[in-house]
């Protein structure tokens, strides 16, 4: 029996804004939700803009403090601000590597920084791990001396993946990480991520609006709307028999129909 790797219990986020001298407005960006993630499992979180999916991803990665709820990984609680502990277990890939990678640092510096900050590895050990990680994502050892702007778009996203992998995490969160790539590069990165999942035992949480991509990479899916989960289940079941109107609309917008067993096998 595969044990639960990540457990999310009643996690929520409410933003409070000052709208005047004596007035405040609250927005429930993420209403209390719960889910679990197993080893080597991929969970897709889909929804329209403003559904709360990116806010949820940032709470999981420790970038935003939850208003309420609990996070546990391997039965160990995660607390906001525990960056070193969390970053060795949960890492994130961002949508636009051009803005998330420091343009003034060489690739060697970008990958070395998390190792210096979160491990006790000696310089030579860090160098070996950097080279090994670059090879894992299809980059050459010679690329260590490059700056991000010297890489092609697909290579930049491979670097983003390498930065996520450098601490050998158990969970990688990808927030629309492949959305900006063309279909060929996107397919290459998907295949690479699936290969790494099999070899390294990584679990993914993939945040996306691209329901076609979700079909190919995810085992389970959460559908979010206005901060709450309106549908969940195995990807095959949700796509074949959607229950919520939003899910039906998203599927119809991409595939033109719910995915029956025959339609599932078609390459749309």
From Swiss-Prot:
<keyword id="KW-1003">Cell membrane</keyword>
<dbReference type="InterPro" id="IPR003593">
    <property type="entry name" value="AAA+_ATPase"/>
</dbReference>
<dbReference type="GO" id="GO:0016887">
    <property type="term" value="F:ATP hydrolysis activity"/>
</dbReference>
<protein>
    <recommendedName>
        <fullName>Peptide transport system ATP-binding protein SapF</fullName>
    </recommendedName>
</protein>
<dbReference type="InterPro" id="IPR003439">
    <property type="entry name" value="ABC_transporter-like_ATP-bd"/>
</dbReference>
<feature type="domain" description="ABC transporter">
    <location>
        <begin position="6"/>
        <end position="251"/>
    </location>
</feature>
<dbReference type="InterPro" id="IPR017871">
    <property type="entry name" value="ABC_transporter-like_CS"/>
</dbReference>
<dbReference type="Pfam" id="PF00005">
    <property type="entry name" value="ABC_tran"/>
</dbReference>
<keyword id="KW-0997">Cell inner membrane</keyword>
<dbReference type="GO" id="GO:0055085">
    <property type="term" value="P:transmembrane transport"/>
</dbReference>
<dbReference type="GO" id="GO:0015031">
    <property type="term" value="P:protein transport"/>
</dbReference>
<feature type="binding site">
    <location>
        <begin position="47"/>
        <end position="54"/>
    </location>
    <ligand>
        <name>ATP</name>
    </ligand>
</feature>
<keyword id="KW-0653">Protein transport</keyword>
<dbReference type="GO" id="GO:0015833">
    <property type="term" value="P:peptide transport"/>
</dbReference>
<dbReference type="GO" id="GO:0005886">
    <property type="term" value="C:plasma membrane"/>
</dbReference>
<keyword id="KW-0067">ATP-binding</keyword>
<comment type="function">
    <text>Involved in a peptide intake transport system that plays a role in the resistance to antimicrobial peptides.</text>
</comment>
<comment type="similarity">
    <text>Belongs to the ABC transporter superfamily.</text>
</comment>
<keyword id="KW-0813">Transport</keyword>
<keyword id="KW-0472">Membrane</keyword>
<dbReference type="GO" id="GO:0005524">
    <property type="term" value="F:ATP binding"/>
</dbReference>
<keyword id="KW-0547">Nucleotide-binding</keyword>
<dbReference type="InterPro" id="IPR027417">
    <property type="entry name" value="P-loop_NTPase"/>
</dbReference>
<dbReference type="InterPro" id="IPR050319">
    <property type="entry name" value="ABC_transp_ATP-bind"/>
</dbReference>
<keyword id="KW-0571">Peptide transport</keyword>
